[in-house]
A protein has these predicted regions:
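Short, charged low-complexity linear segments at domain edges
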Residues: 370-400
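Accessory DNA-binding and partner-docking regions appended to nucleic-acid-acting proteins
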Residues: 2-16, 347-348, 359-364, 374-376, ...
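Helicase motor core with emphasis on the C-terminal RecA-like subdomain
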Residues: 7-20, 24-28, 32-54, 62-64, ...
Length: 624
């Protein structure tokens, strides 16, 4: 264990990597960024969630003199990171608004005495007199900026407090190296990070956005509640997050899950701080393995054993979706990212977009219009993800500008079975209804009203608009409304219809005339079946993992975590337990060959896990 005030002198990068982090080699991009930081250069790392960004400043901190300062946006996030570092034998501390005056004084004192190799701080704290005075006394060779996309107004999570970082750096006696890290940054956001942080010719590494261990799927269930219960029933022994668009939906979903017997909890901004903290800790420590939450439960999650993320509603942007879905599988284990889509999600998202910009009093009318247009463009891209029949992984990578194979072979769309059907008659009915509704009203209506009209629904709105008087009223009464909406979306994908991005009205394109008046055939690629649950994943090669042994190791991990009052993943990650179950180490030396087992953790937990493996092996041998 590294003692207070010590540094890893005499150790090379690989020795530190092995001893403190338990990994035999660096991942893509890590060594380049670490070398740049150790040489005093600025750096920008764009790596997917779970790609090892934090190691790029944690490891150099052990080899550099003095103390590395880490700017982190959320209290819960920095607390989890500090807990994990201390558990690995690395002295780390944090300063945030949740600490008492005595705790702050103790942390300031320890920092002055060289007790920490890493100190985490919220950006709001940087320019306070007390912290500035402390920082000016310390040797700070490196400032790491986590979640650096928060500094860009083009990013999906802009935080004005991040703009204070540059002024803080200017107040230091000597400018340290600055390293910025993010998981979701387009080229425009990356340029903003470099410009605003004033990075000097930074070593820039973009390892890509692909997360091969994540399996993406978009489902269109008739009943989201039934589909959600089915999905969670198939994952009862796993931990996961269910993201919802509104606080009301969080309450409804959490209640639904609890009534069905799931140990679920909730998180949204409407809860008081104490309840949010209590619920988050219950989730982190696996007392409540299912969390229903709004996006307020975002960057504060550093839980590595999340096996699935389900979006009950569609998010407002691809950036937000990829960041939230990326909470799954952070330890590299296979994980599911499933989105339950309905056309009503688009309406909800637009309401949230217009409402949030209208409530922002800091914006001028011109700025408000610009923000709304930008958000609507993002929403259109997100809607495209939900409607595409192409590879879902490819769609996401396209959005972030990363080359990829045409198909991944492992997302819901790649695994689905399709057939070509002649939908000319259905297309003519829908296109005719669009034209007749527009001619009657003088404007275009949305997919919901169109589908109700074609189905023959007696809703008050249809009658109020007089659409029940159209010749196309009830033409598709034999089909459920959800099926009609699917055909409408299919015609939009095929270029026969287009949706107004602001008002949501649907109109015909020039291509529609050929179908209506020239009998152009409409051949569509449609799924053979519409599934309420996830599509069956292709069977991988036989796993080397012994599932009963893995279950025994997880049970031991849980008992140790409960005894020590720490989250289970702090003891060992799921990926480490998978490797342990596959390798079945019989000695301490063999245990150190397991990925994620460093010397400190081997010394702390090794005997218990080796005993569990020996007991299992002995029992299994007797039974066989």
């Amino acid at each position: 264990m590294l003692k207070k005030g010590e540094r890893g002198d005499g150790m090379d990068k690989l020795a530190v990597l092995r001893q403190y982090f338990g990994f035999p080699a660096f991942r893509a991009g890590q060594q380049t960024l670490i070398d740049a930081v150790l040489s005093g250069r600025d750096a920008l790392g764009v790596m997917p969630t779970g790609g090892g960004k934090s190691l790029c400043y944690e490891l150099p901190a052990l080899l550099l003199p003095g103390m590395t300062l880490v700017v982190s946006p959320l209290i819960s996030l920095m607390k989890d990171q500090v807990m994990a570092l201390r558990n690995a034998g690395i002295p780390a501390g944090c300063i945030n608004s949740s600490m008492s005056l005595d705790e702050l004084r103790e942390t300031y004192r320890d920092a002055r005495y060289g007790a920490y190799k890493l100190l985490y701080v919220a950006p709001e704290r940087l320019l306070t007199d007390g912290f500035c005075s402390l920082a000016q006394e310390l040797e700070i060779p490196l400032v790491a900026v986590d979640e650096a996309h928060c500094i860009s107004q083009w990013g999906q999570d802009f935080r004005p407090s991040y703009l204070k970082i540059v002024e803080f750096l200017q107040r230091l006696p000597r400018r340290p190296a600055v390293a910025a890290f993010t998981a979701t940054a387009t080229a425009q956001v990356r340029a903003d990070i470099i410009r605003i942080l004033q990075l000097h010719e930074p070593e820039t590494v973009v390892t890509g956005f692909d997360r091969p261990n994540l399996r993406f799927d978009v489902l269109r269930p008739k009943d989201k509640r039934t589909a959600l219960l089915q999905l969670l029933s198939e994952r009862r022994d796993k931990s996961g997050i269910v993201y919802c668009a509104t606080r009301k939906t969080v309450e409804q979903v959490c209640g639904l899950l609890q009534e069905a017997g799931f140990a679920a909890t909730r998180y949204h901004a409407g809860l008081d701080a104490d309840e949010r903290k209590e619920n988050q800790e219950a989730f982190i420590c696996d007392r409540s393995p299912v969390m229903a939450a709004t996006n307020a439960f975002g960057m504060g999650i550093d839980k590595s054993n999340v096996s699935y993320v389900i979006h009950y509603n569609m998010p407002k942007s691809v950036e937000a979706y990829y960041q939230e879905a990326g909470r799954a599988g952070r330890d590299g284990s296979p994980a599911d990212c499933i989105l339950l889509y309905s056309s009503g999600d688009v309406t909800t998202a637009k309401f949230l977009i217009f409402n949030s910009s209208a409530e922002n009093e800091e914006l001028t009318d011109e700025e408000r219009q610009m923000v709304q247009a930008q958000d609507l463009a993002r929403l259109e891209a997100m809607t495209g993800y939900c409607k595409t029949q192409d590879c879902l992984r490819g769609y996401l990578l396209d959005y972030f500008g990363q080359p990829h194979e045409k198909t991944c072979g492992n997302c819901g769309n790649c695994l689905a079975e399709y057939e070509t059907r002649d939908l000319t008659r259905e297309a003519q009915m829908i296109l005719s209804c669009v034209v007749r509704a527009r001619n009657r009203l003088g404007y275009c209506v949305g997919a919901s009203i169109l589908s109700q009209t074609l189905h023959g629904g007696r809703s008050a709105r249809v009658r109020e608009l007089g659409l029940d008087l159209l010749p196309t009223y009830g033409l598709m009464s034999a089909l459920p409304g959800a099926q009609i909406r699917e055909w409408i979306e299919l015609l939009e994908r095929a270029g026969y219809l287009e949706t107004d991005p602001v008002h949501g009205g649907i109109d015909t394109t020039e291509r529609a005339a050929a179908v209506l008046f020239s009998d152009e055939q409409v051949l569509a690629r449609v799924q053979r079946t519409t599934l309420a649950g996830p599509r069956t994943q292709k069977k991988a090669a036989a796993s080397r993992t012994d599932e009963p042994l893995l279950a025994a190791l997880k049970a031991l991990r849980f008992r140790i975590a409960q005894e020590q009052g720490v989250p289970a993943y702090i003891v060992f990650s799921n990926a480490t337990l998978l490797d342990m179950a596959a390798k079945r180490p019989g000695s301490m030396q063999e245990l150190l060959e397991v990925s994620g087992v460093g010397h400190v953790k081997a010394e702390r937990y090794g005997a218990a896990f080796l005993n569990e493996i020996r007991h299992y092996t002995h029992t299994h041998r007797e039974e066989s």
